[in-house]
């Protein structure tokens, strides 16, 4: 867009020739906004591209005092900064990916638009940087306050590898974010969002306000980037800044986690987990929020998706202490571990019948944490734990045998916590452990040498602990086997058990 003779720049400083009146400048920006909105509504790219070209020319032709100071007459001094904020919002929306009618994740048209828009953001931020060093442009702070939120959302949308980005658009978005941090004098995303001190409140609330219209049930899928921007931004904010925004961040996180697509479920659960570990228990217990979280997470355990199960179990393990506090406060200390018992019972039910290796691995990976959490109360589940342990020891998990290593870790913990209940199970457990050692020794299992060594060591430790729980019964039962066995690996393990004097590992009560 040309401003005719009024585009001539003055020789020094940040002033625009007086021939260009502030109302004319506002009108020019309004016309560009109209062009961008028309492209959004009609889907015609020409209007949007022309508007981008006009905007670039207008930014270059306008000096910083006119760009940030507002009207020169009787108008409000906030008008131009507010208009710049509207322009920034329009640019961010123009470059954002849109939901495809056919459900496709490809957005071939977006990277080029994002690159052009990114260059315009660089020009706008460049004007701010120039104004900061000019004594005649004091209103740059107001302008930056309106620009920073949309600029940040644009940069986070396009800076990482996504279906709607290209290396070029990622590079430009990265430059935009770097320049934004420079002009705001922030050294990190966390400082930008949270502020440096009590006087600087940060921009997290501003970003949430801009995202809010796009994070309700009707709109959150129209822009496939918004969930990623929300999730990534949320996880940059930690204690103690997060709790004051709880009412704004909890509903979108629950909404995303409740979707039918697994990727969205996992993303939502990760958001919920971040909230659980960064918001005080008192805030989570207020208005029964913790119970809402628990029921939402518990229902996900019925989904046979290993990534989702992993995210949910990790979140629940951090949520249990919050739920226990509520029961303690209600004078029900005896029922404090009720939720953990419920989850472990369901997990064991799924483990008994699960045949998919990824899910078996996920369940086994998290089982030790539940045993540690319950401690001696694990005895309530001992019969079912025994069946799960015996079943999982029979199936290898190539290439690292992670499932059996975690099951052996679980067995050690169970024996340490529930040792009075172990003597009656000595024979069953001894047979399972010896069979495992023999299978490893015969080299019939396609796992790595490191995994085989680790399994042998863990199995031997379990035998030593089993012997201590049974007051030496295992050594007596192994005596004849050591004499008749000709496999050096098996004999070596037996000799370690026979020569042991103390149970391996530390007392779990010291954790």
UniProtKB/Swiss-Prot annotation:
GO cellular component: TTT Hsp90 cochaperone complex
Highest rank taxon of the organism: Eukaryota
Residue ranges crossing the lipid bilayer per the database entry: none
Biased composition (Basic and acidic residues): 1-10
UniProt xrefs under Pfam families: Tti2
SUPFAM superfamilies: ARM repeat
Disordered: annotated span: 1-21
Job of this protein: Regulator of the DNA damage response (DDR). Part of the TTT complex that is required to stabilize protein levels of the phosphatidylinositol 3-kinase-related protein kinase (PIKK) family proteins. The TTT complex is involved in the cellular resistance to DNA damage stresses, like ionizing radiation (IR), ultraviolet (UV) and mitomycin C (MMC). Together with the TTT complex and HSP90 may participate in the proper folding of newly synthesized PIKKs.
Quaternary structure (record): Component of the TTT complex composed of TELO2, TTI1 and TTI2. Interacts with TELO2 and TTI1. Interacts with WAC; WAC positively regulates MTOR activity by promoting the assembly of the TTT complex and the RUVBL complex composed of RUVBL1 and RUVBL2 into the TTT-RUVBL complex which leads to the dimerization of the mTORC1 complex and its subsequent activation.
Family: Belongs to the TTI2 family.
Name listed for the protein in its UniProt record: TELO2-interacting protein 2
Native source organism of the sequence: Rattus norvegicus (Rat)
């Amino acid at each position: 867009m040309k401003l005719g003779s009024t585009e001539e720049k003055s020789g020094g400083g940040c002033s625009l020739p007086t021939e260009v009146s502030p109302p004319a400048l506002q009108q020019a920006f309004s016309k560009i906004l109209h062009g961008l909105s028309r492209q959004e509504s009609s889907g015609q790219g020409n209007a949007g591209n022309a508007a981008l070209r006009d905007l670039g020319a207008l930014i270059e032709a306008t000096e910083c005092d006119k760009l940030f100071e507002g009207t020169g007459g009787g108008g409000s001094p906030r008008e131009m900064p507010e208009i710049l904020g509207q322009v920034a919002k329009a640019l961010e929306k123009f470059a954002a990916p849109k939901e495809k009618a056919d459900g496709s994740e490809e957005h071939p048209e977006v990277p080029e638009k994002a690159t052009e828009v990114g260059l315009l953001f660089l020009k706008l931020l460049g004007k701010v940087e120039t104004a900061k060093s000019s004594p005649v442009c004091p209103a740059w702070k107001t302008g930056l306050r309106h620009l920073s939120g949309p600029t940040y959302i644009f940069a986070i949308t396009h800076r990482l590898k996504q279906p709607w980005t290209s290396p070029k658009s990622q590079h430009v978005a990265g430059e935009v974010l770097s320049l934004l941090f420079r002009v705001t004098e922030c050294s990190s995303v966390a400082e930008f969002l949270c502020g440096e001190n009590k006087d600087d409140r940060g921009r997290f609330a501003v970003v949430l306000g801009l995202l809010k219209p796009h994070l309700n049930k009707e709109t959150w899928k129209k822009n496939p980037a918004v969930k990623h921007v929300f999730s990534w931004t949320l996880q940059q904010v930690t204690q103690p800044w997060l709790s004051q925004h709880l009412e704004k961040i909890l509903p979108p996180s629950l909404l995303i986690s409740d979707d039918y697509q697994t990727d969205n479920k996992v993303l939502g659960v990760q958001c919920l987990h971040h909230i659980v570990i960064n918001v005080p228990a008192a805030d989570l217990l207020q208005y029964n929020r913790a119970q809402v979280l628990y029921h939402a997470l518990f229902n996900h355990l019925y989904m046979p998706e290993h990534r989702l199960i992993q995210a949910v179990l990790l979140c629940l393990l951090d949520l249990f202490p919050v739920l226990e506090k509520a029961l303690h406060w209600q004078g029900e200390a005896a029922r404090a571990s009720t939720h953990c018992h419920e989850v472990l019972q369901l997990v064991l039910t799924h483990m008994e019948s699960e045949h998919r290796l990824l899910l078996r691995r996920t369940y086994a990976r998290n089982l030790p944490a539940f045993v540690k959490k319950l401690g001696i109360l694990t005895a309530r589940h001992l019969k079912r734990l025994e069946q799960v342990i015996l079943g999982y020891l029979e199936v290898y998990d190539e290439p690292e045998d992670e499932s059996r290593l975690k099951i052996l870790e679980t067995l050690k913990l169970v024996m340490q916590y529930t040792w009075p209940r172990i003597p009656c199970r000595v024979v069953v457990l001894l047979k399972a452990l010896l069979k495992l050692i023999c299978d490893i020794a015969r080299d019939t299992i396609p796992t790595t040498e490191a995994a085989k060594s680790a399994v042998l060591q863990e199995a031997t430790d379990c035998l030593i602990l089993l012997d201590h729980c049974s007051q030496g019964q295992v050594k007596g039962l192994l005596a004849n086997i050591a004499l008749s066995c000709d496999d050096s690996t098996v004999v070596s393990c037996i000799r370690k058990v026979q020569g042991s004097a103390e149970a391996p590992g530390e007392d779990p009560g010291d954790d």
